[in-house]
Amino acid sequence: MNFFKRLARKVNSAKVIVFRPESEVLDETGYVPPRPAKHYIPDWYKKIPSHVDRNSDVNPRTQEKDHTVKGCVPILDAFTSGYIQELNMDIDVQRSGEGAVAFHWPRQNPWEPVRAPRHPAAMKGFVHPDGYDSNPYLWMQPFEFNVPKGYSILITHPFNRYDLPFLTMSAIIDVDVFPQRAEITFYLKSNFSGVIEKGTPLFQVIPFKREKWESETAEYNNAWRLRWVNLSRNVFGGAYKKNFWHKKEFNEKPQPARCPVTGATEQHGDQDNVR
């Protein structure tokens, strides 16, 4: 094992995040619980070539061909961290001549996927992002989130997904003690009309441990700087992944078997029993 990885090695046991449906009619809504974000890497990212120019000469500094952003492991880590809630149906977004927005979806679906905030003035004074409608909406997802004691979750717009026609707001919730269903606020791109397709990632859920942090500013140390500059000078070429990077694992347990007679499934135990 590499020295740097061995230096920071710890014994890890899997923590469990539970997605519990609030509605008994979940199967009729088309919703699936949030899944590992690694399943939602966008196709446009996958199509990016690994090198700036496959026919170019070797970079004399790195002794390798120049890599594109696809070789940046921290960006890939952002794409694949946590869990993603996807849209359960096609939503047709239409605008009137005055610019009023209307959302349309199959009315036989018993779950309302989108609605406006309960009070129109709820976001008054909040600076909305440029290029988006000033009035926000809510993703009405049907799951409660629950994590082990001492943990919280970050809910945010899918990392690096600037191509989506909406922007989901970020929030942190202590769902270890407040395992409630969250209504997720989002802004729609100005003048967007069209279909937001089923399977579109709506928001990313990342569990993290609550800990006390303090900041400090260290004095400049040239020897320290040169040491790390020399070690990390070829980050895109693989030095970071080879010497420093640690694998992050966000997986899902197999779904419990369903009784063919009653339709009942094995249930999760109390959160106190979750590691």
PLM regions with names:
Residues 1-181, 185-275:
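Non-catalytic terminal segments and appended small domains
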